[in-house]
């Protein structure tokens, strides 16, 4: 039975591991290069409403009978 020739394995495996290491480092560097910006807290603008702050009509739910 012939023997498996393994003389070129270190030549192939070493650059492969180096390439995987470099790709992983570049991905990690790229993901941490720009941290997410914090959200800006702004106060909501209050617009003048012509109808005022109170309700004009109150509606009952459909499940209740009308009350007079």
From Swiss-Prot:
Keywords: Acetylation, ATP synthesis, CF(0), Hydrogen ion transport, Ion transport, Membrane, Mitochondrion, Transmembrane, Transmembrane helix, Transport. The modification N6-succinyllysine is found at residue 54. The modification N6-acetyllysine is found at residues 54, 57. Pfam families: ATP-synt_8. It is found in: Mitochondrion membrane. One of its GO terms (molecular function) is proton transmembrane transporter activity. The chain crosses the membrane at residues 8-24. It is a single-pass membrane protein. Subunit 8, of the mitochondrial membrane ATP synthase complex (F(1)F(0) ATP synthase or Complex V) that produces ATP from ADP in the presence of a proton gradient across the membrane which is generated by electron transport complexes of the respiratory chain. ATP synthase complex consist of a soluble F(1) head domain - the catalytic core - and a membrane F(1) domain - the membrane proton channel. These two domains are linked by a central stalk rotating inside the F(1) region and a stationary peripheral stalk. Belongs to the ATPase protein 8 family. This is ATP synthase F(0) complex subunit 8. It comes from Pongo abelii (Sumatran orangutan). The gene is MT-ATP8.
């Amino acid at each position: 039975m012939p023997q498996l020739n393994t003389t070129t394995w270190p030549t192939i495996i070493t650059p492969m591991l180096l390439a995987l290491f470099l790709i992983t480092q570049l991905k990690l560097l790229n993901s941490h290069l720009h941290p997410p910006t914090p959200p800006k807290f702004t106060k909501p603008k209050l617009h003048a409403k012509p109808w005022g702050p109170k309700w004009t009509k109150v509606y009952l739910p459909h499940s209740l009978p009308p009350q007079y």
